[in-house]
Amino acid sequence: LVEDKLVPLIRSILKERQAGQRRMPVFARDGSAFQKIMHRIRLVAATDMSVMIFGENGTGKEHIAHHLHDKSKRAVKPFVAVDCGSLTKELAPSAFFGHVKGAFTGADCAKKGYFHEAEGGMLFLDEVGNLALETQQMLLRAIQERRYRPVGDKADRSFNVRIIAATNEDLEAAVSEKRFRQDLLYRLHDFGITVPPLRDC
């Protein structure tokens, strides 16, 4: 029964969070479906390919992203997670690229963005399908050119970041509905990992 699996699963996740551990949930270490996921992680972890993780809410997509990071050559560098659902199109440029002092009203000091914080490591875009189209265009340009410009600055900055994204929706359908850019999906989806729902575990 699903209920029989959920209680020990929740207890395990809470215990691991309290211990400050970044491990895969216990349920992810058993069963053929997750052995296949682990195999795909091993295939791609040591590369710099972008990875798209597909799965419903609560299936451990961020755990998989952490595991990819821990098994990669970037493991000693930062892992920066971004909740894409909380970023408005107005806040996104400063959040991703940072800003200089005086760039806008209230910018009393310079701020580093996610790309700077993740330099040399991994940037995890959680629920990337929630990004506004304007933000998608901004990210696409940065990824294509491997450069960005902090808000209010006069010079571009290069970056060395591996991008992992996750989504709980069908992004191909979102492309058809013109809610997600096809070219950005292409850039983010060099390699895909699909996480089965808990009911199938």
What are these regions (language model features)?
Residues 1-7, 93, 137, 181, ...:
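Conserved two-component signaling phosphotransfer/partner-docking surface
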Residues 16-19, 142, 148, 187-191:
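Coiled-coil segment of the histidine kinase dimerization/signal-transmission module
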Residues 1-22:
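N-terminal accessory segments that target, anchor, or regulate ATP-driven/P-loop NTPase machines
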Residues 69, 179-181:
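Short, solvent-exposed amphipathic alpha-helical segments in soluble enzyme
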Residues 21-158, 163-169, 174, 197-200:
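AAA+ ATPase active-site-proximal loops
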